[in-house]
Amino acid sequence: MTSSSRGYQRVDSSGDGGSLLMEEEGDNPHEALLHRNNDDYASTYHHVGVEYDSYEELERHEMDDRVTEIPEGFHRRQRRNLIYGDDVATDEELRVLRREALFGEEVTRAGLGRAEYYEDSHLIHSCDKSGHEDIDDESDDESKDEDEEEEETGIRKFAKLVLPHVALVLLTCTYTVIGALIFYSVEQPHEQMMKEQQLKLIYTRQNEFVDDLIRLAAGNETKRYEWESLAERHMHNMSDQLFVAFEKYFLTSNEVKKNAATETWTFSSSIFFAVTVVTTIGYGNPVPVTNIGRIWCILFSLLGIPLTLVTIADLGKFLSEHLVWLYGNYLKLKYLILSRHRKERREHVCEHCHSHGMGHDMNIEEKRIPAFLVLAILIVYTAFGGVLMSKLEPWSFFTSFYWSFITMTTVGFGDLMPRRDGYMYIILLYIILGLAITTMCIDLVGVQYIRKIHYFGRKIQDARSALAVVGGKVVLVSELYANLMQKRARNMSREAFIVENLYVSKHIIPFIPTDIRCIRYIDQTADAATISTSSSAIDMQSCRFCHSRYSLNRAFK
Amino acid sequence: MHPRGKFLAGHLSAFCITPTTTALISRNHSDWAHLQLLRRTPSSDAGNMNQIHFGTASARRRNAMILENNSGDEDAPKQGFLANLRLALFHLVLIFATVAYIIAGAYLFTKIEHQAELDRYQSYHTIYRNFINNLYQSSNRSVADVENLIDTFTSINFRAFKEGLKPTDFLVPQETSRWSMISAIFFTTTVLTSIGYGNLIPISTGGKIFCVGYAIFGIPLTLVTIADLAKFVADMLIMDPTEDPKTGRQLLVLVFLLGYMTISACVYTILEPMWSFLDSFYFCLVSLLTVGFGDLHPVGTVEYMLCSIVFIFIGLILTTLAVDVSGSVGIAKMHSIGRGFDAMKMLNALRVRKSEFVAKGAVSLSAAARVAGRRLDGQQPHQPRWFAYVPKDALTIPYIDESANVSSRTTTTTHTSI
């Protein structure tokens, strides 16, 4: 719980990755590009260090550094005066006045303004470099959208949110049904013709077999060798013919016995086949065998697979958002339970932050979904599929689980096929939901690992592709900023904005040690005399949000 | 490693770390010395806002140390081969891990399924011989009895076919199994890429259990490897880093994928005697989209099968590239339909208004958000506070103008970690 108590604990990469990264050296093809973008904050960390030609230059540089030191101190003391009145010691005031006389107010104010401009322009520049086109019509449309949104009611907003996704799902279903109809109309007549032809061939060979046996029996031949050779030859022929009928034309044992061909390409099985095509499962039983059927299968796949994958990915994103929301609530509940045992160590909030609506009970945690939780969800859903199929089909639980796993991973061997009758739609619903859950797992866990692995040992070209680890996910800074704006627009609460803002800004400022709360400012030496030196007092001196210092007896709990 | 160095490395993992920084981190310098290296050139004043520089003898000594280290490291820079090798090492290890996983899985599948397959051959051959004996003993029976026996023979055949056997497997005694090493490698490749032809599948319970466990760990490994290689190809396509991702590149990737399919279809038409061009193209499309019907699949020598495996992997890299270039944008746009804001419009609005902020001299994150969002009018969001780093021993470092009072500072400080 140490990370939760600090609130802003950042998720670092693994130690091994860090070591290997530090070992990385040398020849960077994008170094010129980095130097070209001097305004880019990424190049702030690229500089190898300061080089001084002589001690005189060193002295001048040290004098220049004071410009940024005095504004900070002056600004902090002014804020302190506003909050705590005239409690500041006299010698501190004299020190401030002396520095002000030395460098002048203009330098102080200019330095502060320049620093603030520099910090804020970084984020805007990083968004600017994301390469989005600057069109005047866009701003007009944006203004118009804002005017329309203010007039919309809650119901219309909800409809606007839901309808495009429902339309996408309906479009995919319609596309699948139309494809199934075409497969059925093309393949069904051809299938009947070929099956009847195969049955005719099989029964021709069977009749030859029977006639030869009867002829031998009528001749009263008693030689066993002649019997066996005749039987083997006919059985070989029959087996070969049966295998062709089984493998290519999907005849079954019952059809051969009754000499009656049943329909494999029914409308239901056509829908099942179309779904297994667009979801890339591909059982292969049945398959189109005519040229027209195969050409249509090629076109159907090229258009249908992207459409279906986008739809399932869309559903998967909704599922992942709900999972993140549920996990966040779980963390809040856990924090509430555990916080009862840590009342004595609650953090304090200074007056300034408290007046802006950030109380001490505000909890900020990074919601990183653990990988084993996502894997457990996947296995539980597969087991549920095993139970479902073992009830619908005469399969054992392990066979059903095996089929469910092969289907969820879209391997699709085709050795186990469910019946395609009344229960088919339940099976199709299970398959599509399972694929959405698989997409959710990839979205939550897989993407960050792919990005980390790909960018391992490499340098980032510019700020457009700069990465930030937020909430356990590796995202582009431009994407992060866009999502931040979306969140702020969606949630009108001021608290959310402030927290998100602080959260983002924490990743841009340079290194902050973990014991920042214990490090005193230079101008706080006088306060130390009035505060006890116990560790708890020092611990409670800093505000958890802005990390500013204040006196203990003025804390707000 | 120094404890601070871990945080430094973790924080800067997305940015460049130079040999000088590495050398200094390995020498256990203090945090202040680290940040000295990360400072910008003296000409940029804004870059110094987070640094407090002390004009004392101790500070001068530290700077001298830094200068010595800088001059020392620059004499022997490592370039060229070593850097490229270190860059590619992890990715090569990932590829070798995938290949080793495929080969090891193939070996285990042959171990599990080979004996089961031979047992299955033997049992069906025994059934076949018993059938011939029954047929001989019924030589004096009627036509109806003979037809019933033939129906029984048909049932035996179909049951054998469902278990993956062919007529030649059980009509004549067999000593070898179809689960050879190259067949197993082809099978494991199609499992891990989720193609799944289904022409050669595990039948025994042990084989199925192993297949489930094998796929749980193998499919993510293979997908990560293919996605990693696809990103390298995507990086090669980007000539200019500042170029916008346009529709032309998406079409280029799709045309490249279809071209690869067409060329491969021509090759398969030549190599497979029974396949026409349409059959070959059909097979390539069904394979590269990982549908994998299995009605058409390559059968041949070891070299031919290995070339087919390489074809599948290269094709999947191109397919993943197409998904990465075209699909991700489509999915993101589709998902954000109906949301509060379109991210593109937000970014464009910010860029349009950036010039106004610069002119007014009030460029700040909250100000930009307020104007772009137009929803917090009249509200004063809290300004983020930027503060400078102060080292642990700040109290022991005197100012230039306090040198006369150094003797009066005798108080000790207590620093306790949280």
UniProtKB/Swiss-Prot annotation, chain A:
Principal localization reads: membrane
Which residues does the annotated region (Disordered) include? 1-34, 128-151
Q: Which segments sit in the membrane without spanning it? A: 270-290, 397-417
Which residues are modified by glycosylation?
220, 237
Q: Name one GO molecular function term.
A: outward rectifier potassium channel activity
Membrane topology according to the record:
Multi-pass membrane protein
Tell where it localizes. Membrane
User: Could you name the Gene Ontology cellular component terms for this entry?
Assistant: plasma membrane
| Similarity section | Belongs to the two pore domain potassium channel (TC 1.A.1.8) family.
UniProt gene name: twk-7
Q: Which residues lie on this side of the membrane: Cytoplasmic?
A: 1-165, 316-368, 447-557
For this protein, the parts annotated as crossing the membrane are 166-186, 295-315, 369-389, 426-446
Q: Which PANTHER family match?
A: POTASSIUM CHANNEL, SUBFAMILY K, TWIK FAMILY OF POTASSIUM CHANNELS PROTEIN 7
- This one is known as TWiK family of potassium channels protein 7
Q: Does the keyword Glycoprotein apply?
A: yes
| Keywords, ordered alphabetically | Glycoprotein, Ion channel, Ion transport, Membrane, Potassium, Potassium channel, Potassium transport, Transmembrane, Transmembrane helix, Transport
Q: List the Gene3D superfamilies hit by this protein, alphabetically.
A: 1.10.287.70
Q: Which SUPFAM superfamilies match?
A: Voltage-gated potassium channels (SSF81324)
What is one GO biological process annotated to this record? Answer: potassium ion transmembrane transport
Q: Which domain of life is it from?
A: Eukaryota
Locate the compositionally biased regions of type Acidic residues.
Answer: 134-151
Q: Which InterPro entries match?
A: 2pore_dom_K_chnl, 2pore_dom_K_chnl_TASK, K_chnl_dom
Pfam families under this entry? Ion_trans_2
